[in-house]
Design a protein with these regions (language model features):
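HAD-like aspartate-dependent phosphatase fold
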Residues: 1-100
């Protein structure tokens, strides 16, 4: 299964644009993503960050040992997203349960 994973507020804490390199990993993020990879899932980071933040984002992911298979930046910003395949993120324990 291919899983799109948001960056800010899911993998790491929400920070202002120019402070994103200082973000902290969300509790359980690395372990949960590693467990999903171990089950054979493909993990794509899907974020509203801009492409100019790509190198910084890749460096942050490497520094915090976050597994992923690809990155897609420039997700449209909206007040709400309607999607028939979405899982509302409330924490990594619940996300792992929802994803099976």
């Amino acid at each position: 299964m291919t899983i799109l994973v948001d960056m800010d507020g899911v993998i790491c804490t929400e920070e202002k644009t120019f402070e994103r390199a200082l973000a902290k990993p969300m509790p359980g993020a690395r372990e949960a993503l590693a467990a999903l990879k171990a089950k054979g899932h493909t993990l794509i980071i899907y974020s509203a960050r801009t492409w100019s933040e790509l190198r910084m984002t890749e460096a942050w992911l490497k520094q915090h040992d976050i597994p992923y298979d690809g990155i897609h930046l420039g997700k449209p910003v909206a007040d709400r997203i309607l999607d028939d395949r979405a899982v509302r993120f409330t924490g990594w324990d619940a996300a792992l349960k929802d994803l099976g």
